[in-house]
Structure formats: C-alpha cells, structure tokens
Amino acid sequence: MDRYGEKQQQQQMFASYVDASLLAASGEVQGERPRARRRRRRGARCVGGGGGGGEVDGGDPKKRRLSDEQVEMLELSFREERKLETGRKVHLASELGLDPKQVAVWFQNRRARHKSKLLEEEFSKLKHAHDAAILHKCHLENEVLRLKERLVVAEEEVRRLRSAAGSHTASGEGGDIMGLGGSGACVAGSPSSSFSTGTCQPPSFGGGDHLGDDDLVYVPEYGGYADNSVVEWFSLYGLI
C-alpha cells in the first residue's frame, strides 16, 4: 500500500508540474499577442494620419506641396543653372522656404525631364529625316525605272533605224546595177579609151520609130572627107 501511495503521489506531482508549465507557456503567449496587436494599431494610426496628410504633412511646412510661385522660381533658377552648387541651393531653399534636400531632388527630377525632352526632340528629328530619306529613295527608284524604259525604247528605235538603213542601202545598190545594165551605157577600160563595138550597145528603134529628113544631121566635109570620128559614130548607130 505504501508503494501504491507513493506512485499516486508522484503522478499527482508530475501532473501538477505539467499543468503549471502549460499555464505559464500559455500566459506568455497570451501576453505577447496583445502587445503585437497594440503595435499594429499604433502603426495603423501613424499610417492613417500620414495618409490623410493633415498632421504629418501639414505639421512640417517644408514638406508641403510646392506652390505655383515656388515652381516658377525654381524654373527660373533651372534656366540659369542646370545644377546648383551647395551654397546656391541653400540660399534658394531659404528664399522659397523649402528644405535644401527638397530643392536638390526637384532639380534632379527636372534635369531628368529635360534630358528626356531633348531625347524626344532628337528622336523626332531623326525620324523626320529617316522618312524624308525613304521618300527620296522611292522617287529615285521610280526615276530609275522611267530611265530604263526610255533606254529600252531608244535601243529599239536604234535597231529599227539601222535595219531600215541597211535595207535601203542594199536596194539602192541593186537598182544602180540594174540601171547600168538596161540603159545601154558604155563601159570602157579607161576614161580616155575610145568607143568600141564590143562594149557599147546601140539604141534599138522599134518598128514605129522612123527617122525623117529633119532628124538627119549634116556632116561638113573637110578636104573631100568628113570628120572620121563623127562618121564612125554615125555609122556605128546606122544613121548613115
């Protein structure tokens, strides 16, 4: 019985120890949770106050939104100087009632906007020049096509004129040869050679052709004889 009682007592002590440890752990956890909630609530209150812009932004006049006069003064200063020195920045901030850091940030943003504007203007100029170059290229290509067409037409006209000139020359030479053969012209070995019966053909007279008295030629005589050359010519053509 004593041993049984000791075991029960030990079990009770262990159970009480476990219960105490569990209660302590739960108490610590429960104690931390409200603190975390309170911190979150405080942060929410701070965020809410800053979001409204009434207390946080309104409390510090240097962090308020810039007025039109302040912006105009900053723009004038930016036109004079793109980047302010430290003394100039502090002096301008004191004149406008702003924080020097706020003035420095404004100038930094203004330089970035100015650079972006310059890049946009440069891009616009380059794009305009590129479009003009493409248009000029199209005009040149059209002009090249027109010149090629004119060249083809000119080459065809040259070929036509050459062929026409060649055919005209060939026909002219053939006509000259035929005219010489049918006209009965005399062909001599040299310009000073006399007439010969072998190379000259007398003109033919048809049956209707008749020589009258008026067609006869009187040949004067010299020393009882006529001119031998004239007589020879008339006798050649059967006139005497």
Curated annotation (Swiss-Prot):
Keywords: Coiled coil, DNA-binding, Homeobox, Nucleus, Transcription, Transcription regulation. Residues 108-167 form a coiled coil. It holds the Pfam family Homeodomain. The lineage of its organism: Eukaryota, Viridiplantae, Streptophyta, Embryophyta, Tracheophyta. GO terms for biological process: positive regulation of DNA-templated transcription. SUPFAM superfamilies: Homeodomain-like (SSF46689). Residues 26-64 are annotated as: Disordered. Belongs to the HD-ZIP homeobox family. Class I subfamily. Probable transcription factor. It comes from Oryza sativa subsp. japonica. This is Homeobox-leucine zipper protein HOX14. Residues 35-44 have a biased composition (Basic residues). It is found in: Nucleus. One of its GO terms (molecular function) is sequence-specific DNA binding. Its main location: nucleus. The gene is HOX14.
